[in-house]
Structures are given as structure tokens and as C-alpha cells.
């Protein structure tokens, strides 16, 4: 009888992938990045083991949103104090902290537990074209579709 393969955390091989977000649609990019962070593209994927790769995203400031989402989409955060609910539109967030928009979208697509937090730590988002991970020799990854 054959047994199902279960990867061990010590045996997982991780790559560094570089993705250029220039001109890409937010949702299409983030769903594929979430899949890469989880390791679902690998034949050795195991749900309870972090088998994902490190993902570097550059040019986050040049991401595209379809329709009128730039003005209509609202991001909320709360300070924890009474009356501490803050809100800003996608346009304002893109102007101030463009990498935050990608991080929030990807974080929502990962598991909500310690494994998801571990996978999220392998995401590195930069607003411009420069990044500080040249020593890791990242491979350029082309998105499907």
C-alpha cells in the first residue's frame, strides 16, 4: 500500500522569487503570490508545513486597480481607543504606503494562524525598483495569464 508523502520542515527547499508588479492587477497578482508563499505550486506541498518560497515584489507603487476602486475602496484600521477608527481610500494608501496595499491583500489570502504568519514573513514588498536581496540571487518569476 502506498502512503501519502508528507514533507518535513527541514527537507523543504526554498527559492527566492522576484516579481515586478508594474502594470499588474492587484487581485490577480496577490492570489498567485499567496499560492507561492504557501508552496501550492510544488508537488511536495503539505498543508501543515511551511513549504513556500520567499517572494520579493518590486514596483508596488505601479500596481493597477480595475474599475473605480482607486476612489471607492476604503481601508480601515483601529487604534484600539474609543473613537479610534481611521479610514483612507486606496488612492491615499497608494500615495503614502504602496507596499501596504499589497501586504494587506496577500495577508487576507493566507491561513489565519501561526503557519500563515510564518508564511507571510517570507514576503518582501518594495515600492520602487530597488530591493536589498541581491545576495540571495532571486529568480525572475513570470505570472501566469
UniProtKB/Swiss-Prot annotation:
One cellular component term (GO) for this entry is: cytosolic large ribosomal subunit
Sorted UniProt keywords: Ribonucleoprotein, Ribosomal protein
Q: Name one GO molecular function term.
A: mRNA binding
- Keyword Kinase in record: no
InterPro entries registered for this protein in UniProt: Ribosomal_uL13, Ribosomal_uL13_bac-type, Ribosomal_uL13_CS, Ribosomal_uL13_sf
Q: Which GO terms describe its biological process?
A: negative regulation of translation; translation
Question: Which family is annotated?
Answer: Belongs to the universal ribosomal protein uL13 family.
The task this protein performs is described as:
This protein is one of the early assembly proteins of the 50S ribosomal subunit, although it is not seen to bind rRNA by itself. It is important during the early stages of 50S assembly.
Q: How does it assemble?
A: Part of the 50S ribosomal subunit.
Q: What is this protein called?
A: Large ribosomal subunit protein uL13
The gene behind this protein is: rplM
